[in-house]
Amino acid sequence: TKSGKYNEKAEVSYNGYFSVSSPTTSTDYETRGYYSAKIADFFMMATQNTPYTSYTEADYKALWERRNDKTENPARPWVVTDRRNGRQQYVYLANFDWYNYLYDDSRPTWDHNINIKGGTKALSYMVSGRYYQQKGVNRIEPDMFKSYNFRVKLQAEIKPWLTIASNTKFFQSNYKYYGYEDEYNNFRKPTLHALASFVPVNPDGTAVSHTSMTQS
């Protein structure tokens, strides 16, 4: 940014832009519960010699019967109850699209810049500021990154032989997001554990946080 000059008329300039970004890679993830669970079990068996899920053959048969249901069919509910491990528990048989439930493909960005410069006979000045905001990928409770820049540049001629100058800068940024975990695990754990066979909310309205249907 150019500095102000002595005996210069005040000049104010502003520029800003708005843009929207989206992923350039494919987000066409597996949303059929049968295949999602089967793949997880296959790789866990190959590496850990134990399945990832605790689905029975009957569960997999039910998942197979539902594999083409884009939405829940009342005749083939996505959550049923069964007595296991000595208690009644939910068994998840869904075809759930976790990516589009958790994440938003559209990420808007706002950027505002203002600059003021000028000067008098003995003083030149320049003041500039910037505000930047970008929405993150989270859909339900959007995460947000914001940054603030501020700069003041002054030069004063006190005497012909004495000039005082200052250049002050300020920067602050923050990233606000919701969730129990840090930002790393907020993305890592759904990637590892949110099988398409699971749903986010139980029939009784409680959130699905942990389930005995997996080994995690």
Regions picked out by a protein language model, each given a short descriptive name:
Residues 67-72, 105-112:
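Short, mixed-charge, low-aromatic patches
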Residues 109, 120-121, 157-161:
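Outer-membrane beta-barrel channels and translocator barrels
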Residues 1-13, 109-111, 124, 130:
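A beta-strand signature from Gram-negative outer-membrane beta-barrel systems
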Residues 108-112, 119, 144-148:
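Residues that define the transmembrane beta-barrel architecture of outer-membrane proteins
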